[in-house]
Curated annotation (Swiss-Prot):
Identification of the protein by name: Transcriptional regulatory protein QseB
Function recorded in the entry: Member of a two-component regulatory system QseB/QseC. Activates the flagella regulon by activating transcription of FlhDC. Currently it is not known whether this effect is direct or not.
Classification via Gene3D superfamilies: 3.40.50.2300, 6.10.250.690, Winged helix-like DNA-binding domain superfamily/Winged helix DNA-binding domain (1.10.10.10)
Residues of the Response regulatory domain: 2-116
One of the GO BP terms on file: DNA-templated transcription
Protein induction: By the signal autoinducer AI-2, through MqsR.
Coiled coil regions, renumbered to chain: none
Any GO CC annotation of this UniProt entry: protein-DNA complex
DNA-binding region: 124-218
Post-translational modification: Phosphorylated by QseC.
Keywords linked to the UniProt accession: Activator, Cytoplasm, DNA-binding, Phosphoprotein, Transcription, Transcription regulation, Two-component regulatory system
Annotated positions of the 4-aspartylphosphate modification: 51
Taxon lineage: Bacteria, Pseudomonadati, Pseudomonadota, Gammaproteobacteria, Enterobacterales
Amino acid sequence: MRILLIEDDMLIGDGIKTGLSKMGFSVDWFTQGRQGKEALYSAPYDAVILDLTLPGMDGRDILREWREKGQREPVLILTARDALAERVEGLRLGADDYLCKPFALIEVAARLEALMRRTNGQASNELRHGNVMLDPGKRIATLAGEPLTLKPKEFALLELLMRNAGRVLSRKLIEEKLYTWDEEVTSNAVEVHVHHLRRKLGSDFIRTVHGIGYTLGEK
């Protein structure tokens, strides 16, 4: 899951980016309001964590512009503004959730996962395809009921494919979902991850659509 984080507090921002990265999220972090606002237009983010008090452009103005321009990415407001009127205003501007500082990182992750479930119309955290089960919240994967050991990028790729079952995902889109701007990506990185997953899940689990990308095979 690729997350856009817009937070000007260096300590908080670093803690969120580091903590979520360890949980398997890919996080792009911006400290300036305008830069963060523009970032949403240039990459396929799954969710946004937005502070309200930002240099350059207030978080409420950013959110208002996104919604007016049709951006529908789920937004979690994370701010010290805890007054009822502030929370109501943020939600009415188009935020999907609101969390006041101080916070526990595990709750931030849980709220992001809940936003993704609602976005994808899921009732449960678990993703299933054939005899493969994935629980992104618990970072658990099983094959025919047996524990499956996956590296972080393998887990992220499998989650992406399972969340988009029935769709063909291009290599470019997969790269954009799996890697942040400050990560180096080799030309065959996606192919390598697909190869490793096929070795663990079976050669037919991921299907190559030549000239287009990858999709899950038949159940």
